Amino acid sequence: MLQDIVEQWQIMQQALAPLRLTRWQLTKMFAAQVYRDHPVGALLGISLSVVLLLWVISVVTRPKKLEDVLGLPVLGGSRTLKSDFLRIIEEGKQRYPDTPYIVNASGLQYVVYPPIFFDEIKRLTEQEASAQDFFHTVTYGQWTHIGAETDALWKTIAVDLARSVPVKVPSKQKDARIAFDKYVGYCPESKPVTIFDTMMKIVATTNACSFVGREVGTGEWPQVVQQLPMSVYFAVMTLSIVPRIFRPVLLPIVLIPALLVQRKMRKILAPGIRQDMEEYERAADRKELLKPTEDGKLPFTQWLMARYKPGEATAHQLATDHLLTSFESTVSTAATLYNMILDLAVRPELQDELRQEVEEIMVDGKLPATHLKELKKMDSMMRETFRVNPFALFSLYRITRKPIQLSSGPKLPAGTILCVDSHHINNSAELFPEPAKFDPYRFLKKREEPGAENRFQFVSTGPTDPNWGDGTQACPGRFFANSTLKVCLAHVLLKYNVSLREGQERPKMVSMPNGIWAPDMAAQVLFQSRD
């Protein structure tokens, strides 16, 4: 076929020579002729040309490998180690205990610093190295809006939402009861419950009742909220295994499910946001409107409107803020609750002890309207679960916004992803004797030491508490999450006995190819009602 095409070109050149056509005109005529005579071959040639062009663009625009720029070693090069991040950081700890190294994760390169750099990295300002930029990058935030939190949203969560926690405890207790009744129900006999999926729905419902009201929160909203992170993570994981040259083409396609979910969420939110905006504009006393009450939903939309500058608080922006809040408050809280339920399921005696603590602080069946610091045993168990089964092997994720020189290692150019090895903080024998042992009262005993009463709590941050991050960019929603978790755990303890099937071991977390620990989606726990 190629010889025929060459002959056609020569014949066409000779035949059309008297017309004195330009090369471009001649090429167009020749291409049309080839397509008529060899349509399949022409399409194949066009496809190969496009692939070749993409490859050339990829090679020309490909950034230099980070190891070539920084001169740091790269770990995890073999197929076996590429996704086994636990083995990677164990190797990193052994070979480079005091210096950084590079790992490849989901198509990106991370500079991993040892734990001794924790305090130095946490002190970096957002203008120097941004956590928000990191999450925006790894979740393709230009499409999904993840990691696009505004200052108004950040302050609303860190200040207004945190202050509202005590007053909402009684209402949240009702919301948790509604959620458990719907998704677990009354179990006179042991009932197997797929634990992560169920905890996702329960957390989504309990939180949604506070943010968007009980009517919306107990409708289809929890199911839609549950779909958002799954659709985003599907896109992220898919793109991470696709060659770089095809990602721009596939990105809009693999993100279609996430965009459709967001569209549905905006549609559900629209009437409530419109009503909230009208109430805020009509309010004669906005200070009174901004006060959270025990009943009803939080004035979350109004808090945002009060913090935005004139013209910024559009209905679209407010809906985006609600989407981000739902995304960030559901998955991490549900994964933590999943692990806590499993830790209770393998320790019946712990259930009895924590149940007694809950009963001692309740009055007329109600938890106190506080931050629930009274539940010291429960808090210690939660903190120990969080230590043994954290979100990830790393912490203090950042992307540098300008060149940064730390006390050791090379100067990091702008756009570098860095993080800290938090696994070897959580599993430090120096900090936590017998770190492999689950000790539910480990932190209760630490708080009994002189001067440590307010330390070592579930929401604590610091060089020995890496999982929430630290510094000015620590997780702002941890106080709200703490309340949701304690209310849900209290409900489980009072209403159910939980266990695993006889002979079954505690399901293990799964290492993802980006250093994150993922739950076993098929894991089940037996629930049996206590009355």
Curated annotation (Swiss-Prot):
InterPro entries: Cyt_P450, Cyt_P450_E_grp-IV, Cyt_P450_sf. Keywords: Heme, Iron, Membrane, Metal-binding, Monooxygenase, Oxidoreductase, Transmembrane, Transmembrane helix. Its main location: membrane. Heme binds at residue 475. It is an enzyme of class 1 (oxidoreductase). It is a single-pass membrane protein. GO terms for cellular component: membrane. The chain crosses the membrane at residues 40-60. One of its GO terms (biological process) is secondary metabolic process. Pathway: Mycotoxin biosynthesis. GO terms for molecular function: heme binding; iron ion binding; oxidoreductase activity, acting on paired donors, with incorporation or reduction of molecular oxygen, reduced flavin or flavoprotein as one donor, and incorporation of one atom of oxygen. It is found in: Membrane. Pfam families: p450. CDD domains: CYP503A1-like. Its EC number is 1.-.-.-. Its cofactor is heme. SUPFAM superfamilies: Cytochrome P450. Cytochrome P450 monooxygenase; part of the gene cluster that mediates the biosynthesis of the cytotoxic leucine-containing cytochalasans, including aspochalasin C, aspochalasin E, TMC-169, flavichalasine F, aspergillin PZ, aspochalasin M and flavichalasine G. The first step in the pathway is catalyzed by the hybrid PKS-NRPS ffsA that utilizes 8 units of malonyl-CoA to iteratively assemble the octaketide chain before addition of L-leucine by the C-terminal NRPS modules. Because ffsA lacks a designated enoylreductase (ER) domain, the required activity is provided the enoyl reductase fssC. Belongs to the cytochrome P450 family. This is Cytochrome P450 monooxygenase ffsD. It comes from Aspergillus flavipes. The lineage of its organism: Eukaryota, Fungi, Dikarya, Ascomycota, Pezizomycotina. The gene is ffsD.
